[in-house]
């Protein structure tokens, strides 16, 4: 391990715990045994774990130093792609850690999870009401999963009509994952450029919308942080050709409770736990990507 010189400034040089190993050091002492020992066969216990010998203060200082070098929303702006990363109130994390939620095993029988099931059922109603949609599913495990679920709903809707549409309109201001979700559903993405104001124009959508197009994927507010003020006219154009309007909720926290997505022409909308609401985005979770739909798509949930 390279030694740090006596210089000023921040030195990001922290050895691994195994490199700090000092034989004989101990961070925790067990009480003296008051019964006879009974050594177990090695086939049962396995090899002795390769844990380093460290004192408690060695471990505390190690992780404290590493935590001070970490960067996140508590220490500065977090511009991760097009995602809206914001400060998360600590009280929300405390509620999420309530034992009834955090301690419930996924395989518990329904007779032992009625409280959690009731909460989830009521949450579906709350999300439908605040978004202006008609039905909600909480099944998608994260935003990208919800996005894919939304596109599969559009695919299933057209299939039920005997229509095999092959294209989907994806604006240049849409969430970057949209083309991937469209591709997984067998759609070919048709790009549309935003206008000089950074939003979609109805004319640009009308030019590419036809009866081979399943719909449009709109992020609203878009990746530039601008509300798509022409969304009603755009939705009318798409609907007139039999298409559906999908809205990516990556930036929905800006308009949640303000814009009624159902009234402005959205057919399917996905939300993000870590963007629309306030759970930290890190380490791959925890995630949730509820999908909200209008009445015509409810049978396909």
PLM region descriptions:
Residues 31, 136, 149-152:
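Acyl-CoA thioester-binding alpha/beta core of soluble enzymes
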Residues 11, 16, 52-70, 99-141, ...:
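Conserved N-terminal alpha-helix of the aminotransferase class I/II PLP-enzyme fold
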